[in-house]
Amino acid sequence: MLKTVHQKAGRHTRPVRAWLKLLWQRIDEDNMTTLAGNLAYVSLLSLVPLIAVVFALFAAFPMFSDVSIQLRHFIFANFMPATGDVIQRYIEQFVANSNKMTAVGACGLIVTALLLMYAIDSALNTIWRSKRTRPKVYSFAVYWMILTLGPLLAGASLAISSYLLSLRWASDLNTVIDNVLRILPLLLSWISFWLLYSIVPTTRVPNRDALVGAFVAALLFEAGKKGFALYITMFPSYQLIYGVLAVIPILFVWVYWTWCIVLLGAEITVTLGEYRKLKQAAEQEEADQP
């Protein structure tokens, strides 16, 4: 009886072990942690230019003036670790200084922000091992669309949410709205990762695989955010070492950890499709044998 149970358990866990082995093999071959380090470096260089471009877009639309403040607080409260308020103050100072630049400097900011998107494109297509390339004009159009429409859509959604919350009939739904707002960061992360894994690769990505990989990445992102905040709160020894500069290594580590999660979700998405193809090929080979 016990032997039968072990045999059945082995049959059920064998595919999982094979898939995990394939996942680890791909992570090792793609040098995922090195790719994450490259993206973290480019992100830190592009962070202020990217935020400056986004805020400039909001400034161009007076209707979004109040929403931009809400969006700023929402991002730093839900997508940054416990020191988000400190990082927010520094970044806002940097952005305020960048607003004093000339037209040439502003163009440099835009180019730097677009370089981050190019780096993300290259890293994801390296993981998908896609040799296809988009026309440069098409790639630029996609990057610019993400850079402009993304913040505006986020601002519009926050404006609609604020309007609905201000309605009288919505006061009876406070409990429901509170519960929705709690899971909103997870949902936004899931949708963002899904769009990233579906649109950026130059090869076709099965929608189901992208949803699974994005969901795992979103869960890891939320868990990592909570764990990182707990570590900062419970073990403040880094403050004794770095003092007032403690926020710098925290930001570096958080950006690197975030890119590790993003690329791991991409590896999971790719591995799901590759494992399915290998399994189908093995079954076809067995069927062809006399």
UniProtKB/Swiss-Prot annotation:
Statement: the UniProt record of this protein carries the keyword Secreted: no
InterPro entries, per the entry: UPF0761_bac, Virul_fac_BrkB
Subcellular location field: Cell inner membrane
Membrane topology field: Multi-pass membrane protein
Keywords for this protein: Cell inner membrane, Cell membrane, Membrane, Transmembrane, Transmembrane helix
Keyword Magnesium attributed: no
Record topology, Cytoplasmic segments: 1-43, 125-139, 204-209, 265-290
Superkingdom to which the source organism belongs: Bacteria
Transmembrane residue ranges: 44-64, 104-124, 140-160, 183-203, 210-230, 244-264
GO CC term, one of those recorded: plasma membrane
Disulfide bonds, paired cysteine numbers: none
Full protein name: UPF0761 membrane protein YihY
This protein's encoding gene: yihY
